[in-house]
Amino acid sequence: MGQAHITKHIFVTGGVASSLGKGLTASSLGRLLKARGLRVTMQKLDPYLNVDPGTMNPFQHGEVFVTDDGAETDLDIGHYERFLDVSLDGSANVTTGQVYSAVIARERRGGYLGQTVQVVPHITDEIKDRIRRLADDSVDVVITEVGGTVGDIESLPYLEAIRQVRHEVGRDNALTVHVSLVPYLAPSGELKTKPTQHSVAALRSIGLQPDAVVCRSDRPLPDSLKKKIAMMCDVDDEAVVGAPDASSIYDIPRVLHREGLDAYVVRRLGLSFRDVDWTEWDTLLRRVHHPANTATIAIVGKYVDLPDAYLSVTEALRAGAFATDTRVDLRWVTSDECSSPDATATLLDGIDGVIVPGGFGVRGIEGKLTALRHARENGIPTLGICLGLQCMVIEAARSLAGLEAANSTEFVPETPHPVISTMADQHEVVAGTRDMGGTMRLGLYSCVLAPGTLAQREYGAAEVAERHRHRYEVNNDYRHRLAAAGLVFSGTSPDGRLVEVVELPADVHPYYVGTQAHPEFRSRPTRAHPLFRGLVAAAVAHADRRRGMLPVDLPSEDAPTPENGVPENGAAQTRGVTAGRSGGSIRRGASASRPSVSSNGTAALVSP
């Protein structure tokens, strides 16, 4: 009889400070183990009391990452999916709100048979059950990241649950990796290990002895400091891993492998493995560091002061850049600042592409509409995502279809032309008579693409599936009028009732596409999403024309309207114009107050 399969557990904790990059460390380790032939899944334990991040302010939490099954999760789940090239489900993100809700609901049903319900054992048992639920025969390793920092009150039940899991599965089947900060003090010119020593001491006081320590720093750690940390924290010398800032987040697996973390883990857990297969990742790194092309793309959004609010968008854009061998310089543009056509022209000067991402609420909407009009009229490749599609429809209704008061019922409930309206099953939510959290149109839905359209060409398929997160949709009462004005409805739900993709014809604009979905959630660094790849390719072509001052065919300002002679397919007369001059690569809007972010992530997510 064969030996029973035993799933191994790796727990990743953090100390000294938040935002050290536990998620990227865990993701990179997962990538290394998968490259060694192991089957890996990942999970994030979040100590906040929200059931999920769906109703959180983007400025507080960053983006909400949506899984195939419609779960609204932490942005680290996006890192897990991108680095491992897998699709996770809602079980990958556990929150204190979920845990307490489940325990209290069970108590109300009489599930505890009159017991006094307590943090230990009932809350910790629920946490353990959610950890162990992932450990089935299809998985060799479960990597579980604990959110927050050791010493936080709200993290204590999770750390106690991990201690118990280690005891129950056996020391040979569980391993704890502690990510800690080793700061550099400029006045003394020294890296200091004392914060890490105290952090490990705090972890040990809870009953958890780390097996490995990943030391985050802004420079490499000398071997003498590694030995000191090993001695003072009671871990093996080879288990102290230096993790200095990297030039790209995609360098982190190489850094951790060079430090020997993955080799130590597989040996410590007794895992069968092969050597790391770097074929795919090395190809990626070559494109990260040695691209052949360049282009500048603006993200016109409401939450640009916190780039994490658009994390998957920027990573999908970088993946599109890698796929086209391009370095993309990002320019962050606050939609509020696009207050007039002249201001917008200044902010978007020298731009080769525009992304209008998702969001909620009326603030900044008029600025997005102005930016979209500028991009449409000047032939700048543009991708609208979720709210971006809705803004494209509103702008087309106003500028092309002559519906000057067109709007969304989200912004102006009594608008005379609601070209964007509340979905039928969302009216009670909008009215406040039904819960807001977890009630949007969430998860994976199919989309049928019209033959011969740009969207169908980019996808290379007649039907695709994308993840969604929205309450509003294109109003079908206006579809015929908008189509007559030149807007192409190139993708719909299989029943044809819900608009999924809009675009302008290729003879009117080189790349002007909007999707109601969130395609960024299905992009991978080694497998770019078609819409982002297409946007970058179009932006590179635009950049080449702009730098060469070559003629660009654009719709004529006095082209006929649908009422006076434009063919039904929306084709318009074009005129030759000269593209604007090149702008600098370090821009935030019109100023240099924020560095641009290259497609390799150099100026943003540079630490594991």
UniProtKB/Swiss-Prot annotation:
Composition-biased stretches (Low complexity): 584-594
InterPro entries cross-referenced by the UniProt entry: Class_I_gatase-like, CTP_synthase, CTP_synthase_N, GATASE, GATase1_CTP_Synthase, P-loop_NTPase
Superkingdom classification of source: Bacteria
Active site residues per record: 386 (nucleophile), 518, 520
Assigned keywords, A-Z: ATP-binding, Glutamine amidotransferase, Ligase, Magnesium, Metal-binding, Nucleotide-binding, Pyrimidine biosynthesis
Top-level EC class as recorded in UniProt: ligase
EC number assigned by the record: 6.3.4.2
Region (Amidoligase domain): 1-271
Binding positions for ATP per the UniProt entry: 19-24, 76
Binding positions (CTP): 18, 152-154, 192-197, 228
Domain Glutamine amidotransferase type-1, chain residue ranges per copy: 296-545
Associated pathway: Pyrimidine metabolism; CTP biosynthesis via de novo pathway; CTP from UDP: step 2/2
Catalytic activity: UTP + L-glutamine + ATP + H2O = CTP + L-glutamate + ADP + phosphate + 2 H(+); L-glutamine + H2O = L-glutamate + NH4(+); UTP + NH4(+) + ATP = CTP + ADP + phosphate + 2 H(+)
GO cellular component: cytosol
Positions of Mg(2+) binding: 76, 145
Pfam families: CTP_synth_N, GATase
Disulphides: none
Annotated residues for binding of UTP: 18, 192-197, 228
MF annotations from Gene Ontology: ATP binding; CTP synthase activity; glutaminase activity; identical protein binding; metal ion binding
Activity regulation comment: Allosterically activated by GTP, when glutamine is the substrate; GTP has no effect on the reaction when ammonia is the substrate. The allosteric effector GTP functions by stabilizing the protein conformation that binds the tetrahedral intermediate(s) formed during glutamine hydrolysis. Inhibited by the product CTP, via allosteric rather than competitive inhibition.
Presence of keyword Translocase: no
Additional facts recorded: CTPSs have evolved a hybrid strategy for distinguishing between UTP and CTP. The overlapping regions of the product feedback inhibitory and substrate sites recognize a common feature in both compounds, the triphosphate moiety. To differentiate isosteric substrate and product pyrimidine rings, an additional pocket far from the expected kinase/ligase catalytic site, specifically recognizes the cytosine and ribose portions of the product inhibitor.
PANTHER family: CTP SYNTHASE, CTP SYNTHASE-RELATED
Family from the record: Belongs to the CTP synthase family.
Protein name per its UniProtKB record: CTP synthase
Species in which this protein is naturally found: Frankia casuarinae (strain DSM 45818 / CECT 9043 / HFP020203 / CcI3)
